[in-house]
Amino acid sequence: MITADNITSHEFIGLNTEIVQSTNPQVIGLNGRIENETKSMFTINTENGMKSIAKSTSNWKFSIDSNDVIVEGSRIAKRPFDRIGGKA
């Protein structure tokens, strides 16, 4: 189960997110559902279509159990497999 304490060790695909801070002011406020994740990017399904956004340059807001959790992109800028702790 995803909680505010363990969100950085879970899968993000399928979660809704919003960019609350970024080095690129044009993406602040962008929100939608995460459709894909790579080491450095999220692909988000927004009202205006799919957008690929760099993880490390933004802070991301997720709503978990009616609580908003802000995650620094630099903390999650890893391959999902490595972040989750998978073994080969």
Swiss-Prot record:
Keyword list, A-Z: Cytoplasm, Endonuclease, Hydrolase, Nuclease, tRNA processing
Gene Ontology biological process: tRNA 5'-leader removal
Catalyzed chemical reaction(s): Endonucleolytic cleavage of RNA, removing 5'-extranucleotides from tRNA precursor
Signal peptide: none
Pfam annotation, one family: RNase_P-MRP_p29
InterPro entries (UniProt xref): RNase_P/MRP_Rpp29_sf, RNP1, Rof/RNase_P-like, Rpp29/RNP1
A cellular-component GO term for this protein: cytoplasm
Family that this chain belongs to: Belongs to the eukaryotic/archaeal RNase P protein component 1 family.
GO molecular function list: ribonuclease P activity; RNA binding
Quaternary structure annotation from Swiss-Prot or TrEMBL: Consists of a catalytic RNA component and at least 4-5 protein subunits.
Recorded coiled-coil stretches: none
Task of the protein: Part of ribonuclease P, a protein complex that generates mature tRNA molecules by cleaving their 5'-ends.
EC number assigned by the record: 3.1.26.5
Phylogenetic placement of the source organism: Archaea, Nitrososphaerota, Nitrososphaeria, Nitrosopumilales, Nitrosopumilaceae
Top EC class for this record: hydrolase
Protein known as: Ribonuclease P protein component 1
Annotated compartments: Cytoplasm
